[in-house]
């Protein structure tokens, strides 16, 4: 989606290391969260007649028209870290267990509070983000946990977008118990806004990624938890699938990368300086 998120930098590094070691070339394009730009980039790869396209869809539905062109051109496609709406258009999928990521955060919250007012930071065009928030909400609802939804704020998963949006919410109400963010960058933006209002110690903030920055905030007791993904495993499994497809070997249609919840209770078991 954007290399502005270090998570995707790590995935790219893992893939690039293997590709270059084999004497091949990895061309990386950053769509900067623009679905139209991403579609143009895919079509550019089709024109170049590349051997395979790895896609992290900005908009899981809008990318379909470009993927149809790739399929018609006979170019295999692997969806990386997020699903596309029409899965028949891709040859393989490597994705984290995003629903479980949200569910794990919800289960942790239920251990700590009996009810609460929750602000959600969302990204409705991205399936991974959709599934995380869905997993969180449905887990609470199935358990009968009482919560008030303060709002679903569209933030593109970006720190620089989420911070002013949360600042704006705080001008209208400071009655917030929990912030649930689709990823760690948006959680960091929320925490910056809360900290400016001296509210961070009173609000439980949940994210997803397991970034070094989030783990450090958890260690400092300033963030509650992050559902940790593994960009290293995602990158390795993607490139493994890539070369199997190019060799004409069978691959499992979807590889699910497990997630682990990192909280104040277990953060010391993880490296604060690196990724999983």
For each feature predicted by the language model, list its residue ranges.
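Extracytoplasmic "Venus flytrap"
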Residues: 1-18, 22, 27-44, 48-50, ...
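Hydrophobic alpha-helical segments within soluble ligand-binding/sensing domains
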Residues: 38, 94-118, 130-131, 159-163, ...
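Short beta-strand elements in bilobed, periplasmic/extracellular small-molecule ligand-binding domains
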Residues: 19-31, 117-122, 140-159
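Structural recognition of the beta-strand scaffold that forms the well-ordered cores
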Residues: 27-29, 54-56, 76-81, 95, ...
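Short, solvent-exposed amphipathic alpha-helices that sit
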Residues: 7-24, 101-105, 128-146, 161, ...
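Hydrophobic alpha-helical
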Residues: 46, 55-70, 136, 151, ...
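Hinge/cleft segment of the Venus flytrap/periplasmic-binding protein
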Residues: 138-143, 230-276
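Flexible loop/hinge segments that line or gate small-molecule binding clefts
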Residues: 56, 60-100, 111, 117, ...
């Amino acid at each position: 989606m954007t290399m502005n998120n270090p998570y995707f930098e790590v995935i790219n590094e893992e893939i690039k290391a293997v590709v270059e070691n084999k004497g091949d070339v990895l061309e990386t394009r950053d769509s900067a969260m623009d679905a139209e730009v991403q579609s143009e980039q895919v079509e550019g790869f089709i024109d170049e007649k590349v051997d395979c396209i790895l896609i992290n869809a900005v908009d899981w539905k809008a990318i379909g028209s470009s993927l149809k062109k790739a399929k018609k051109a006979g170019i295999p496609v692997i969806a990386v870290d997020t699903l596309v709406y029409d899965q028949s258009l891709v040859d393989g999928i490597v994705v984290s267990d995003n629903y479980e990521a949200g569910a794990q955060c919800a289960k942790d919250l239920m251990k700590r509070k009996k009810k609460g007012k929750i602000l959600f930071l969302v990204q409705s065009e991205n399936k991974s983000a959709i599934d995380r928030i869905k997993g969180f909400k449905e887990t609470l609802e199935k358990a009968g946990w009482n919560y008030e939804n303060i709002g679903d704020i569209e933030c593109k998963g970006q720190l620089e977008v989420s911070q002013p949006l949360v600042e704006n919410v705080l001008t209208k109400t400071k009655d917030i118990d929990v912030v649930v963010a689709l990823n760690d960058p948006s959680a960091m933006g929320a925490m910056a806004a809360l900290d400016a209002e001296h509210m961070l110690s009173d609000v439980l903030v949940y994210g997803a990624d397991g970034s070094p920055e989030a783990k450090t905030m958890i260690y400092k007791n300033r963030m509650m938890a992050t559902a940790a993904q593994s960009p290293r495993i995602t990158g390795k499994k993607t490139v493994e699938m890539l070369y199997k497809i190019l060799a004409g070997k069978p691959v499992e249609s979807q590889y699910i990368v497990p997630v682990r919840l990192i909280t104040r209770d277990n953060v010391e078991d993880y490296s604060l300086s690196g990724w999983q």
